[in-house]
Design a protein with these regions (language model features):
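Short glycine-/acidic-enriched loop or helix-start segments at secondary-structure transitions
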Residues: 45-48, 135-139, 169-170
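Short, surface-exposed acidic-centric catalytic microdomains
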Residues: 45-105
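Short, hydrophobic/glycine-enriched beta-strand segments
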Residues: 28, 33-39
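Short amphipathic alpha-helices and their capping/turn segments at secondary-structure boundaries
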Residues: 23-29, 72-81, 117
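C-terminal capping/extension of enzyme domains
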Residues: 1-25, 29-30, 55, 98-114, ...
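Short hydrophobic segments within beta-strands
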Residues: 35-37, 129, 160
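Short, solvent-exposed loop/turn segments at secondary-structure junctions
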Residues: 40-44, 93-96, 132-134, 164-166
């Protein structure tokens, strides 16, 4: 991979303002172990074009602490996730300054688009990064963190807390445990899935 593409950089105020409604390309491939689905990109993330890109977002540290990555990746190294059979997408594509700028109707519409994507890509698990949007998308108002009873787009559904630094309900140790629980379960499920496939 081009090392220049991995070099972190900070967007200017003008670039942040211009990032409104921008989209960040999905990081996907078929047959992933886990496809992480964020709520929608923030302005910083959209400006740099990398998922969970804002400094202070705890997604990347939680991913490492949970055992998904061999070391702490920066957002600029996100493409390396595909080698680990991990991907990232969003419920709503457009960037906003705050997630609460999205309406429930917009989240539901985004959920339908996401469901179509999941059916196409067929990850073993789709992990929603944020319980509030999952409750709206699924219509399950009492959904809790962890494995869900209902599948989503044919894949197992799992809910993780929002790793934003603004979410004080979950500290790094708790996030590490929850991400680790997902990794153990999803990896085992993926292996079982592989064994069931016919040999071509």
């Amino acid at each position: 991979m081009n090392q220049k593409l991995l070099t972190p950089w900070k967007p200017t105020k003008a670039q942040l303002l211009a990032a409104h409604n921008k989209r960040v390309p999905d990081l996907v491939a078929k047959d992933l172990i886990v496809l992480f689905a964020g709520i929608n990109p923030g302005l910083y993330t959209a400006a740099i074009g990398r998922h969970f890109g804002r400094p202070g977002n705890r997604f990347w540290p939680a991913l490492y602490a949970g055992g998904f990555t061999p070391r702490l990746f920066s957002p600029f190294e996100s493409d390396l996730l595909l080698d680990l059979k991990l991907g990232i997408t969003n419920v709503v594509d457009r960037a906003t300054a705050r997630a609460d700028e999205l309406t429930n109707d917009e989240l539901r519409a985004g959920g339908k688009r996401l469901e179509a994507k999941v059916k196409l890509w067929a990850p073993t698990v789709v992990a929603f990064v944020g319980i509030g949007p999952y409750r709206i998308v699924s219509g399950i108002k009492d959904a809790r963190v962890g494995l869900q009873k209902n599948r989503f787009g044919g894949s197992h559904a799992w809910v993780l807390p929002n790793p934003s630094g603004l979410n004080a309900h979950y500290q790094p140790a708790a996030l590490a445990q929850l991400f680790g629980d997902l990794r153990v379960w999803a990896t085992a499920q993926h292996k079982r899935r592989q064994k069931k496939r016919p040999i071509s």
